[in-house]
C-alpha cells in the first residue's frame, strides 16, 4: 500500500495536509472497446423475427406432443433449459413439470426401473422449479444394505454426473444429498484422472461441472458452453440448436447495445478523472448485473441497477481507501438527509461531486418510472443510506485499529457488502404486477434468502481477499475476526467460513421451494447474485484484479458471437 499527501481546505479555510492510503489500481483492461456499438433497429427486428419463427416450430415439436414418456420429456426440458431457451417457454415447461410432479405425488409415482440418470434429472428439474420432492424417496433405492451408494454405480459415469448436479439442490439436513455429493465428486474426479485426453464431450462436461455445477453457473455462460457440446451430439435436434445459436447472438447484440449506452454514461460522467482512486470497472459491473437478469424485457432494470452498483463501487472506494473519517462522517450525514442543499457543507470537492452524482442518478431513476412506480426508489434510497452507515462503522474499526469479534463483524459487514441494497434495488426497474409495495415491505425485514445471499457475498469476498491477495487489506475481515474470536488457525477459519457458504446455498434452495413468501421471479434475484459471487470470487477477487475468468466471461458473453 502506498500513500499520497493532498492539500485540502477545511470549512474554516485552514489548509492542512491529509495522508491518504491508496492502492495501486489495475486500469480497465477494455479501454473504449464497448463505447461504440452500432446495430440498426432493422437488423435487430430481423434477428428477433428469425427467433420467433423458430420458437413456433419448437413449441409445436416439443411442447405440442403429449405422447412422450416422462423420461423423454424431462430430457427435452433439460436440453431446452441448458441451451438457454427456457425463458421463451416458461409456461410450457412449468405445465409439463407440474404434471410430472402431480403423478409423483398423487399416484405414488415410483419408477422401479428408473436409472440413476433419469431419477437424478427428475429430482433436479423439479427442485429447480420449486417443487417439494423428497430426496430420500428418489435416491434411497440406489443405496446398499450398509447405507452406502452402490458400487455398481461407479461405472455409470453419466448417472454420476446427473446425481452430482442434483446434489447441489439440497436443503439443510438432507444427508443423503451430502453423501451423494461426496460420492460423485470422488468418482468423477477419478474418472478424469484415469483419462489421458479430456477432449470428448463427456469429459468436458465433467470438468466444467466439477469447477462450477449448474446450480452455481451463470445461465448465459452455461448456455454458451452447452451449445458447443450439444452441437457435437449426433442425435441433437437441429431446430433447437439453430434456435439456441440465433437466440444467443440476438441477446448478445441487445446486451452489447446496452453496454455501449452504459459505457457512454460512465465516460460522459467522467468518473475516472473525478474519482481517480476508484476502480474503473463499468464493463465488469454490467456483467455482474447481466448475471442477475439477462432477458430483454429487463432492459430498464439492468440500466438502473448497473448505475446503482457503479455508484456503490465508488462509495466503497471512498470509504475503504480514500476518505478521512471526518469526510466519511460528513458524507454519511449528507446521504441521510438526501437534500441537495446540504452539498455546500461537504468538503473537499470530491465529496460534493459524488453527492451530486448520487442524488441526480436517483432522480433520473424516478423519472424513468411511471408515476405509480416511483415509490420504489424510496426503498432503494433507504438501503443505500444503510450501506453507507455500515461503511462508516467499518472505517472506524480501521481508524482505531480494532479487530471486532466475529459476531460483531458479521452484524455490520453483512450490510456493508451491499447485497441487501442491490437485491432491493434490482426490483426498481422490473415491470409487471409482481413488484408491489408489499414486496418491498417484505424485503425490508431480515429474510432468510436475502441473508443467505448476503452471507455468500460477504464470506466469499473476505476469503478471496485474505487468501489470494498479496497485499493484505488493513480493514478487518471475516477470516481474521473468526481466528481471533475462536482461537483457530487460518486454515481452520477458511474451513468454517466455507461451511457457512455451503449452508447458505442450501438455505437459498429451501427458500425457493413452493409456496414462497413472494413470487419466484423476485426471489431468483438473490440466487443469481449468489451465482456471480461463485464466478468472480471463488479463486480470488475477479473484480478488483481482472484476470482470466473475468476476461473469458466478458469475451464469451459480450464480444464473440457463436458462429
Swiss-Prot record:
SUPFAM superfamilies: Terpenoid cyclases/Protein prenyltransferases, Terpenoid synthases
GO biological process: diterpenoid biosynthetic process
Expressed in which tissues: Expressed in young leaves. Detected in trichomes and cones.
Main function: Sesquiterpene synthase that catalyzes the formation of germacrene A. Can use farnesyl diphosphate as substrate, but not geranyl diphosphate or geranylgeranyl diphosphate. Beta-elemene, the initially measured product in the assay, is derived nonenzymatically from germacrene A.
Domain notes: The Asp-Asp-Xaa-Xaa-Asp/Glu (DDXXD/E) motif is important for the catalytic activity, presumably through binding to Mg(2+).
Annotated binding of Mg(2+) 3, by residue: 461, 469
Motif window: DDXXD motif: 316-320
Organism this protein belongs to: Humulus lupulus
Metal-binding keyword on record: yes
Any coiled-coil regions, as ranges: none
Catalytic activity entry: (2E,6E)-farnesyl diphosphate = (+)-(R)-germacrene A + diphosphate
Cofactor names: Mg(2+)
Family label: Belongs to the terpene synthase family. Tpsa subfamily.
Signal peptide: none
Keywords of this entry: Lyase, Magnesium, Metal-binding
PANTHER family membership: ALPHA-HUMULENE_(-)-(E)-BETA-CARYOPHYLLENE SYNTHASE, OS04G0344100 PROTEIN-RELATED
Residues holding Mg(2+) 2: 316, 320
Pathway(s) per entry: Secondary metabolite biosynthesis; terpenoid biosynthesis
Pfam families: Terpene_synth, Terpene_synth_C
InterPro entries: Isoprenoid_synthase_dom_sf (IPR008949), Terpene_cyclase-like_1_C (IPR034741), Terpene_cyclase_plant_C1 (IPR044814), Terpene_synth_N (IPR001906), Terpene_synth_N_sf (IPR036965), Terpene_synthase-like (IPR050148), Terpene_synthase_metal-bd (IPR005630), Terpenoid_cyclase/PrenylTrfase (IPR008930)
Binding site for Mg(2+) 1: 316, 320
Protein name: Germacrene-A synthase
Amino acid at each position: 500500500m502506498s500513500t499520497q499527501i493532498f492539500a485540502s481546505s477545511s470549512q474554516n479555510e485552514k489548509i492542512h495536509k491529509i495522508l491518504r492510503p491508496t492502492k495501486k489500481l489495475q486500469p480497465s483492461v477494455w479501454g473504449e472497446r464497448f463505447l461504440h456499438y452500432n446495430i440498426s433497429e432493422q437488423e435487430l427486428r430481423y434477428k428477433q423475427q428469425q427467433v420467433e419463427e423458430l420458437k413456433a416450430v419448437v413449441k409445436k415439436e416439443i411442447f405440442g406432443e403429449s405422447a412422450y414418456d416422462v423420461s423423454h420429456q424431462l430430457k427435452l426440458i433439460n436440453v431446452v433449459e441448458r441451451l438457454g431457451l427456457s425463458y421463451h417457454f416458461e409456461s410450457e415447461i412449468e405445465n409439463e413439470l407440474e404434471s410430472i410432479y402431480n403423478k409423483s405425488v398423487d399416484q405414488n409415482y415410483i419408477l422401479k426401473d428408473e436409472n440413476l440418470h433419469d431419477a437424478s434429472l427428475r429430482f433436479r428439474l423439479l427442485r429447480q422449479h420449486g417443487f417439494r420432492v423428497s430426496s430420500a424417496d428418489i435416491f434411497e433405492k440406489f443405496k446398499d444394505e450398509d447405507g452406502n451408494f452402490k458400487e455398481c454405480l461407479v461405472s455409470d459415469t453419466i448417472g454420476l454426473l446427473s446425481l452430482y448436479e442434483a446434489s447441489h439442490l439440497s436443503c439443510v439436513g438432507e444427508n443423503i444429498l451430502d453423501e451423494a455429493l461426496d460420492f460423485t465428486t470422488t468418482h468423477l474426479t477419478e474418472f478424469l484422472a484415469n483419462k489421458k485426453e479430456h477432449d470428448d464431450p463427456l469429459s468436458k462436461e465433467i470438468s466444467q461441472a466439477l469447477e462450477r455445477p449448474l446450480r452455481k453457473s451463470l445461465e448465459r455462460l452455461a448456455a454458451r458452453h452447452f451449445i458447443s457440446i450439444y452441437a457435437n451430439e449426433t442425435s441433437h435436434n437441429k431446430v433447437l440448436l439453430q434456435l439456441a445459436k440465433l437466440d444467443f447472438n440476438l441477446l448478445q447484440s441487445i446486451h452489447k447495445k446496452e453496454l455501449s449506452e452504459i459505457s457512454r454514461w460512465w465516460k460522459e460522467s467522467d468518473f475516472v478523472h473525478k474519482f481517480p482512486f476508484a476502480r474503473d470497472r463499468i464493463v465488469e459491473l454490467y456483467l455482474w448485473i447481466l448475471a442477475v437478469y439477462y432477458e430483454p424485457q429487463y432492459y430498464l432494470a439492468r440500466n438502473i441497477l448497473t448505475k446503482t452498483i457503479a455508484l456503490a463501487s465508488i462509495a466503497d472506494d471512498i470509504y475503504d481507501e480514500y476518505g478521512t473519517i471526518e469526510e466519511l462522517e460528513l458524507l454519511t450525514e449528507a446521504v441521510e438527509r438526501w437534500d441537495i442543499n446540504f452539498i455546500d457543507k461537504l468538503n473537499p470537492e470530491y465529496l460534493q461531486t459524488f453527492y451530486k452524482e448520487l442524488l441526480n442518478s436517483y432522480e433520473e431513476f424516478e423519472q424513468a418510472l411511471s408515476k405509480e412506480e416511483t415509490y420504489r426508489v424510496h426503498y432503494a434510497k433507504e438501503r443505500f443510506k444503510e450501506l453507507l452507515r455500515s461503511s462508516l462503522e467499518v472505517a472506524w474499526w480501521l481508524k482505531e485499529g480494532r479487530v471486532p469479534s466475529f459476531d460483531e463483524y458479521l452484524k455490520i459487514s453483512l450490510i456493508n457488502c451491499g447485497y441487501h441494497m442491490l437485491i432491493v434495488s434490482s426490483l426498481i426497474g422490473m415491470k409487471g404486477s409482481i413488484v408491489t409495495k408489499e414486496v418491498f415491505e417484505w424485503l425490508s425485514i431480515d429474510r432468510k434468502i436475502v441473508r443467505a445471499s448476503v452471507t455468500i457475498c460477504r464470506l466469499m469476498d473476505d476469503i478471496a481477499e485474505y487468501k489470494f491477495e498479496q497485499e493484505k487489506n488493513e480493514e478487518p475481515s471475516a477470516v481474521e475476526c473468526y481466528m481471533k474470536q475462536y482461537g483457530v488457525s487460518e486454515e481452520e477459519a477458511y474451513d468454517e467460513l466455507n461451511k457457512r457458504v455451503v449452508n447458505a446455498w442450501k438455505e437459498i434452495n429451501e427458500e425457493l421451494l413452493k409456496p414462497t413468501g413472494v413470487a419466484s421471479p423476485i426471489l431468483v434475484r438473490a440466487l443469481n447474485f449468489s451465482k456471480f459471487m461463485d464466478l468472480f470470487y471463488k479463486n480470488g477477487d475477479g473484480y478488483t484484479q481482472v484476470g482470466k475468468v473475468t476476461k473469458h466471461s466478458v469475451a464469451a458473453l459480450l464480444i464473440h458471437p457463436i458462429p
